[in-house]
Regions:
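Hydrophobic ligand-binding cavity/cleft-lining segments
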Residues: 1-48
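Hydrophobic pocket/interface hotspot
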Residues: 18-22, 28, 52, 75, ...
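Hydrophobic-ligand binding "helix-grip"
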Residues: 34, 59-112, 118-120, 148
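Short coil-to-beta transition motif at edge beta-strands of beta-rich domains
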Residues: 46-58
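A conserved amphipathic terminal alpha-helix motif
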Residues: 112-153
Length: 153
């Protein structure tokens, strides 16, 4: 079974406008299609190991009775206007090390944006059997919200 989803979409905006939104905690909440991200605290990120807090609510997935909880988003890759990736540290210990990210490629019409979700680093087989937590359609929907958000600025 695949341990990675990748979805690509052309967004009619400059890479810098897209990347700026992706570096802000509020931007993550604004484009989330799962309904889990409720609010966030922290400053925009600008380097690997930068982090911020997201207040979550698992109710929207209706899969586990976790209720409200917080996660720390930790940046694992950062190339300005090109690539951002992060993992989360939440309630599970040790952390699972699943990754989310965006790669941006400038085009004549805007930016080709690839969103990905990678759970290949998860080593706990019992937990790994529950992956993916976010479906591929969720990434596609989030890209749609991202497009709407930056194209209408």
């Amino acid at each position: 079974m695949a341990e990675l989803f990748e979805i690509t979409r052309l967004i009619y905006a400059e890479p810098s406008a897209i990347f700026e939104l992706l570096t802000t905690p509020e931007g993550h909440v604004a484009i989330d299609s799962s309904g889990m991200l409720q609010s966030a605290e922290g400053s925009p990120v600008s380097a690997v190991d930068d982090e911020f807090v997201v207040h979550m609510d698992r109710e929207s997935l209706n899969d586990l009775p976790m209720g409200k909880y917080d996660v720390r988003v930790i940046i694992t890759a950062f190339e300005k206007d090109r690539w951002i990736e992060w993992t989360i540290i939440g309630t599970v210990r040790p952390p699972l090390d699943h990754r989310y990210g965006y790669r941006l490629e400038p085009t004549d019409d805007g930016t080709l944006v690839t969103s990905y979700y990678d759970w290949s680093r998860v080593t706990n087989e019992d937990i790994k059997g529950r992956f993916p937590i976010i479906p591929e359609a969720g990434l596609r929907a989030t890209l749609g919200i991202l497009a709407r958000t930056v194209e209408n600025r």
